[in-house]
Structures are given as structure tokens and as C-alpha cells.
């Protein structure tokens, strides 16, 4: 049965006479943006490997996007390795917007890290967002929106450890004691494009936090089928989920993985930059090309392509994740306000406190004077066709499908 929770009516009286406040059609009706602070790492493995994927086909591949890399302190041999990985992603990531990458070469402050990456920012509630309540990595958000949402900053930021024992010969054949830079960049660009959780963990209290879930987070499921993005935050319940078993629920990835939900890397001891944001090491480390997004790269191990599983997961990120299980009735939307304009009103509100546990599917803004309703997924809502000099009262209701 459908559940609806209404917020008490609030009045908009007399304000339309003078239109003292002009409805902020922009930027209020565009999108929200937050900085990206979580990094996805790839660590240096210790097991000498001869695992090598087949070289990319020599035929001309269709270019689906353009990447522009800003190099900071990179040696010439390394630039060629980076460009090779960029060319692979250009043929596999579809976007009409140039993906700018800020890449830095220097010693890592973390022992064992080969490379790290993060998106430039996260965006939500933009036109084209499959789920406006989730936060999309810059490059993915731009691809879905069809425009650059932040022209002042790069879409991806990558740092590479210059002190690692790299194969500098450019022959694509690292020895059993060398690491392949192209493979590291193939991995890190994946993080920058959105293969990344926005969670955090407090090891002292065992608390997990996920204040701004990404679509990546929304596709992660606990063993009992709950979405990671729907668990209370901060909470020990979320902390337990981050350090036990999580699987991917996207249909494309399940199909690519032989009908099995891919298992994610969630060790009992949480590892910042590795936990949650990688495929499980034990499950996929020997799976050839599908081990690209495991948390470590062994010496001698190389990849020339993302692999079917990673590409399927990236495709899932472009769709709306399945709705989670509602465990609560929707509470009222909070902090409703009305901004007036000429013959119009902009109604803004915040989601109810139990947005996740109630699985809110839409909001209904009702003009109590006329009886007309507007359904929306996000705030604010622009109401037009009002008569200047007339008082109006509106209500806002939250609804889920349970």
C-alpha cells in the first residue's frame, strides 16, 4: 500500500502583489555540488605475476569521448604510458564533454600505494541524473547532463608514486619485480569516472558514515539485500556492513559475471581507499582482465583493457539503481519555504529525516486554493500561473511505494 506523509500547509499571502523576492530560477533549479574527498588507491602487490591481458586490438576503435591530461612533473616515458590508458578509456567511456585529468607525479605519503584517484567533485539533482538524490562523479555527471557542470576544475585528479619500481622501457612487459604504469592508470581512471564509494569509517567506535551516497554506493547490497546507501548514518550498523560482505546489484554486471552478483572488497579491518571501492581480491585476482579493479597490482601484472565486468558496472552507473526496501513510513518534508515572483512561486523544502529508510519515491506540492498538484523528485519546484494580489497556501507531501 502506498504511504504518503503530508507537511502541514503553509501560506503564501500577499507577497505576489509586490513580488519582493524574485524566484531564483538559476542556480536553484540546476544542480548541487560537493567536493570529492575520498580517494581510490591501488597498492603494490608482492606476488610476482605473469598475468597479462591480450593487447588491445590494433584496428581503429570508435572514439566515444575525449580526455585532456594536465601533466605535473611526469617524465616523458610515463606520459606515453598514461596516454595509452587514456586512449583505451576514450574508446570505452561515452561522453560529449571533454574529460579533463589533473595528473601528478611524486612520492606517495602512503607506503605501498602505486596510484590514487578521485573525481573533481560530485553532483546531484542535475538535468539527466538517473536518481537526483545520489551524487555522481564529475565526468559521469557531465556525460549524463550533456554539458560541463564545472568548467573551472578537472573531472579527475590522479596522483602516481614516482618512487615505485616502474617498468620504464615502454615495452609493455614488466619483469617480476616491476610495475606497469599503464595498468595503474587504467585502474585509477576507473575510480575517477565513478567507481568509488563515498563512505568513511571510524575504527575506534566502529561507526560507518555515508552522508552523500553515490550511485556506486546505491548498487552495493548487504547479505540480506539492503542497499548500503539506505543504512542509517553514522551508525554501527553501517560500520558492520562496510567490514562484512557486500555485493553489486546492477543487472549489467550480474550478467557479465555469469549471473552472480559480483563480490566487493570488504576486509574485516577497514582499509581507507581500498575497502568497498574495489572488487574482491580473493574472488577476482586470478580472473584475468576482470581483476583490473581489485585493490592491488602485482609486479609483472599488466592490463590493456578495462574488461567486460568493469564496463558493465560503469554502464550500471548510468541507470537508476533499484529501489531499496522501505523499513519506515515517510516523515514530513522539512524547512518548506516559498519565494515569490511575478505570477509564480518557488517552493523549496528539505527531504524528511528518514529519506533513506522510508525510500521516498516522490514529493507532491499541492496548491490548496486551486487543488492543482505538482509531482517532483527534488526541491525546489516552480509553480507558475498564479494571480498577482491573491493569497495561496501550499502543502508538501512525501511518498513511497510501500
Predicted feature residues:
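Secretory targeting and sorting signals
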Residues: 2-28
Amino acid at each position: 500500500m502506498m504511504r504518503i506523509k503530508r507537511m502541514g500547509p503553509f501560506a503564501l499571502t500577499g507577497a505576489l502583489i509586490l513580488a519582493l523576492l524574485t524566484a531564483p530560477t538559476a542556480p536553484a533549479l540546476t544542480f548541487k555540488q560537493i567536493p570529492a574527498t575520498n580517494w581510490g588507491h591501488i597498492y603494490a602487490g608482492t606476488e610476482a605475476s605473469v598475468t597479462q591481458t591480450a593487447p588491445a586490438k590494433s584496428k581503429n576503435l570508435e572514439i566515444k569521448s575525449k580526455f585532456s591530461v594536465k601533466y605535473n612533473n611526469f617524465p616523458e616515458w610515463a606520459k606515453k604510458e598514461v596516454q595509452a590508458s587514456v586512449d583505451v578509456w576514450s574508446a570505452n567511456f561515452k561522453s560529449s564533454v571533454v574529460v579533463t585529468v589533473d595528473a601528478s607525479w611524486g612520492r606517495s605519503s602512503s607506503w605501498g600505494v602505486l596510484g590514487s584517484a578521485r573525481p573533481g567533485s560530485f553532483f546531484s539533482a542535475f538535468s539527466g541524473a538517473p536518481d537526483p538524490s545520489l551524487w555522481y562523479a564529475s565526468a559521469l555527471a557531465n556525460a549524463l547532463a550533456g554539458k560541463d557542470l564545472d568548467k573551472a576544475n578537472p573531472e579527475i585528479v590522479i596522483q602516481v608514486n614516482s618512487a615505485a619500481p616502474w617498468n620504464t622501457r615502454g615495452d609493455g612487459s614488466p619483469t617480476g619485480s616491476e610495475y606497469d604504469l599503464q595498468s595503474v592508470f587504467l585502474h585509477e581512471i576507473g575510480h575517477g569516472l565513478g567507481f568509488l564509494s563515498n563512505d568513511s569509517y571510524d575504527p575506534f567506535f566502529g561507526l560507518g558514515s555515508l552522508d552523500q551516497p553515490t550511485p556506486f554506493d546505491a548498487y552495493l547490497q548487504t547479505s540480506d539485500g539492503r542497499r548500503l546507501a539506505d543504512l542509517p548514518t553514522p551508525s554501527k550498523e553501517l560500520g558492520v556492513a562496510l567490514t562484512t560482505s557486500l555485493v553489486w546489484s546492477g543487472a549489467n554486471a550480474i550478467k557479465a559475471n555469469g549471473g552472480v552478483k559480483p563480490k566487493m572488497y570488504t576486509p574485516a579491518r577497514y582499509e581507507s581507499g581500498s575497502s568497498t571501492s574495489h572488487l574482491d581480491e580473493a574472488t577476482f585476482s586470478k580472473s584475468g582482465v576482470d581483476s583490473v579493479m581489485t585493490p592491488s597490482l602485482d609486479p609483472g601484472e599488466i592490463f590493456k583493457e578495462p574488461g567486460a565486468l568493469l564496463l558493465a558496472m560503469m554502464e550500471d552507473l548510468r541507470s537508476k539503481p533499484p529501489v531499496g526496501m522501505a523499513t519506515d513510513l515517510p516523515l514530513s518534508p522539512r524547512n518548506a519555504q516559498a519565494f515569490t515572483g511575478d505570477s509564480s512561486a518557488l517552493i523549496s523544502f528539505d527531504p524528511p529525516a528518514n529519506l533513506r529508510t522510508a525510500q521516498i519515491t516522490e514529493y507532491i506540492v499541492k496548491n490548496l486554493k486551486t487543488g492543482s498538484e505538482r509531482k517532483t523528485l527534488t526541491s525546489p519546484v516552480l509553480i507558475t500561473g498564479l494571480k498577482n494580489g491573491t493569497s495561496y497556501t501550499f502543502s508538501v507531501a512525501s511518498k513511497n511505494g510501500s
